[in-house]
């Protein structure tokens, strides 16, 4: 198999189902060697099942590609390190890390339990930190040893994290953290030949079933298929994307866009008198753009 990712070794978390599976299959189709990570739990993070990751490995091998399965819980820092080491030990190198694993425990803030908050932050935010921390340390050591590195980190944020969505304070906070993590890690790791980008996907998967997306018309469903998210991730994983880092890409079958992030808006000269702040804020708000809706458009 050959393609734009020929010979590149990719670790993909949460790759047993949904979007992650599409990444694994397309990257393998473009010549990458894949570590298919998946704990195999349900969409709330409960349970374990090795078969989803193993099934994707079998699909890749049937295509003529190379892949191995990994069942690590990415929220476990030590297990995340072992996953990265597995890639290096088995394939002899590591070129790409795709942090995709995730769960949902949606709840209105006033009803959210501490465990629902902790679980989502753990899988999404810590589950991005752990693999990235270990991969980054590996690449840094290669550079210190005189080797040239051309590596990629591809994280997964969400419109809920960069724009907001009701009922997802835990999920949105985790995804907003991942967006910031992406920008900052891009700054820190550029010196080692590592780029860091993220995608904010919109697709119909088992995680979106309770959001009413299953009730969409067939044309819309087709445009929201997970397959549409894989091309940008595959390109970002390739050597062709070398000059792109610190960016968030919003993607569905209908649109590929760059999320422009926070920018300073209108400004005024401040005052040290709190009784004079009201008119200044009113002036600022009159000139400022409104917050975007959950699709990134002005309200």
What are the functions of these language-model segments?
Residues 132, 174:
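Active-site helix of classical SDR
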Residues 198, 218-299:
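C-terminal helical subdomain
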Residues 6, 63-66, 86-99, 105, ...:
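A glycine-rich helix->loop->beta "capping" turn
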Residues 108-109, 113-121:
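Substrate-binding pocket helix/loop in short-chain dehydrogenase/reductase
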Residues 158:
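Residue(s) in the substrate-gating loop at a strand-loop-helix junction
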Residues 50, 54, 71-84, 114:
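The beta1-alpha1 cofactor-binding region of Rossmann-like NAD(H)/NADP(H)-dependent oxidoreductases
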Residues 2-36:
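Canonical Rossmann dinucleotide-binding motif of NAD(H)/NADP(H)-dependent dehydrogenases/reductases
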